[in-house]
Amino acid sequence: MRSNIKLLFWFAVIQILSFHFSFTTLAEVPKNYLKGKFYTSVKDHFLVATEKMTDGRFKKAIIVMLDNDEEGAWGLVVNKPIGKVPLNLLINTSQKLKNEKKELYNVEIPIFWGGPVSKEQIYILHSKEYKNQTTESYKDFSITRDYKILFDIAENKGPQRYLIILGYSGWADGQLEGEMEVDHWILSELDSQIVFEEESKNKWPQAYENSFIRL
């Protein structure tokens, strides 16, 4: 009988301690603990605008985050199409070589708005099978800034999947963290299928549905 009472006593103690530990743990969850795991950087995630976003430019935006360090963070919006423009308008005059494939200058190419910074800078976000000397490789895709890739795309010799993006989105050190603190942004797992295959209008709902839930 006594052994049963002791057993019940220690069971009750363990339950109380477990509850206290769980409560303390949840109360002290750090800000970088999302969906059951820690993250040390927003790089290689989707940054997804929430309904609390106050900047109209980023309403229902999803951003592929490319870097996050002590100097800040930057990425490319991938669901804000601008429209189609002739290849000729995407190539800087100083880069146009004499007699280089001028027949392609009028080929129209779809482009996207990547953010309000360096709005004339072109980034080609694409699948990894395509490479040239300026290609930078990331986890699930690559980025090329060499204008010659545009000619390859116009000739159907470019990457299988791509987005041509003008400008980028950038934050100073601590700025993005402040915006996340007031729930203007939430993180979501990066998915190349959403980036390249989904229609623009469907990208935000898909990314938001897959977003991390803050504890």
Question: Predicted segments — roles?
Answer:
Residues 3, 22-23:
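A detector of low-complexity, intrinsically disordered, Ser/Thr/Gly/Pro/Ala-rich segments
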Residues 2-11:
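Bacterial N-terminal signal peptides that target proteins for export
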Residues 10-22:
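Bacterial N-terminal signal peptides
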Residues 26-165, 169-215:
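A short aromatic-anchored loop/beta-hairpin motif
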